Amino acid sequence: ELPEVETTVRGLRKVLEGRRLNSVTPRRADLRRAIPEDLGQRLTGARVTGLGRRAKYGLIETDRGDTLVFHLGMSGRWRIDPQDIGKHDHLLIVTDDGRTLSLNDPRRFGSLDLLRTDAVAEWPPFKAIGPEPLGGAVTGKWLKERFAGRTAAVKLLLLDQRIVAGLGNIYVCEALFRARIDPRKAAGKVSGRKLDALAAAIPAVLDAAIAAGGSSLRDFAAPDGELGYFSKTFDVYGREGEPCGCDGTVGRIVQGGRSTFFCPACQK
């Protein structure tokens, strides 16, 4: 999810920014889709000029006008100076100061793409997605306009990357709880007051998760191996049957094939 990718980018920035890539070696031909055949050739010898994030994708820009775009999928993570290289380490990078980075992805649902930097904004996956939830672009007014007349559940629309970029299941559950919105409610029926609360809750939840290093569920760890600790402060996610704090009990339903955690007593 977005906080995990942001945490990853910040960790990589400390090691990669300004460094020359002495070698870049893909160790297989594909992940979720094919890895560009010329990726190693185009990146070897390049200097990293910046790192960033768009939605759930990480971006590594170079002085050759190329940008490496990575997606971690379900189980991907970058490792810095790994003690051993195994079968799940699918891309190796060695920098000019002797650091080694590996992209490790046991389930291979991630991806690696190499784009011309001046064409990144026009890449089809980026053209189709909505604004970033951090930075103030997503307001109650914005949500009201996007939700107008929609009968789909508000939770499902928040997961639609065309409306807001980068939101995933965990943080949508948490934001809806903070805004006291029932995830089953038709999006077009949510009041303007509650949409204002939701627009404030989304960045608050994400900022807190980034500050805590993300949520270490299953496979995620930052590049330096540190685990994220936001999961220890979840209000509802993964807490089915536990008390809410409002005298209610956290429940679980399935929406769109994913678990939704919420408190039926205080989320209306």
Please place each PLM-identified region on the residue numbering.
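Generic detection of long, well-ordered alpha-helical segments
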Residues: 2, 133, 137, 191-199
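Surface-exposed binding/hinge segments that line
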Residues: 1-111
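Glycine-centered flexibility motif
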Residues: 34, 45, 55, 76, ...
